[in-house]
Design a protein with these regions (language model features):
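Residue-level signal for inorganic ion chemistry
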Residues: 9, 18, 75, 88-89, ...
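Conserved beta-loop-beta/alpha segment of the NTase-like Rossmann-fold superfamily
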Residues: 67-129, 143
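Conserved alpha/beta core of the MobA/IspD/sugar-nucleotide pyrophosphorylase nucleotidyltransferase superfamily
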Residues: 140-209
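A recurrent flexible, glycine/aromatic-enriched loop bordering the glycosyltransferase active site
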Residues: 132-142
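Conserved donor nucleotide-binding strand/loop of the catalytic core
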Residues: 54-66
């Protein structure tokens, strides 16, 4: 991102990206418990930001790990009752309430749900001799929140870590459980570059008009 500030703390429309994300999830899942995984070294910074911005959305903070798997594992230690769990990237503040609710409802009924969108650009696969075109209709872009019944997710995270675990769905799928797909929203971008941040600012401005 070209900044020493962790990307989730970067300013978006006068407050940190992470606050937008938490507020959106809180609005979508009223009365739900929010658990935030952060590196321990960022605890004090987050506390200070919450004070500066008078951030009032109730949430717990747990220590994140080196990998996503470790961070989610630590957060799951706070789950002590049967429920549906939504795991969302802190730098995806533009998720639509309808997508969150759709994921949660599908997970409630079928145990799993993740949002996906179609690929609109051409794809090529690397080969030893160069590359070959692939059928983009056979691939999807995966987003978050990824939602699961607590029974399914807690059992999945009892597995040993594998480098093949790129997201929560891959952890659950490793147990042989089918992942249900729902339609995501295209503007639910993961803010990882300066260009992403500019796009998010445009979307935020349009949403506030």
């Amino acid at each position: 991102m070209g900044s020493t500030i962790p990307k989730q703390f970067l300013d978006l429309n006068s407050k940190p990206i992470l606050m937008h994300t938490i507020e959106k999830m809180h609005q979508s899942l009223d009365h739900s418990e929010i658990i935030l995984a952060l590196p321990k070294s960022e605890f004090d910074t987050w506390k200070k930001l919450c004070q500066e911005h008078q951030f009032k959305v109730n949430h717990q903070v747990v220590e994140g790990g080196v990998t996503r798997f470790e961070s989610v594992s630590n957060a799951l230690k706070k789950v002590n009752e049967q429920s549906v769990i939504a795991i969302h990237d802190g730098v995806r503040p533009l998720i639509k309430t309808s997508v969150v609710n759709g994921c949660m409802q599908t997970a409630l009924e079928k145990g799993t749900a993740i949002p996906v969108i179609a690929i609109e650009e051409s794809l090529r696969q690397k080969t030893d001799s160069g590359s070959v075109v692939v059928n983009r209709e056979e691939y999807l872009i995966v987003q978050t929140p990824q939602c699961f019944s607590s029974e399914v997710l807690l059992k999945a995270y009892q597995q040993d870590y594998s480098p093949t675990f790129t997201d929560d769905a891959s952890v659950v799928e490793a147990m042989g459980i089918e992942i249900q797909l729902i339609q995501g929203n295209k503007d639910n971008i993961k803010i990882t570059t300066p260009e992403d941040l500019k796009k998010a600012q445009v979307y935020i401005n349009l949403m506030s008009e």
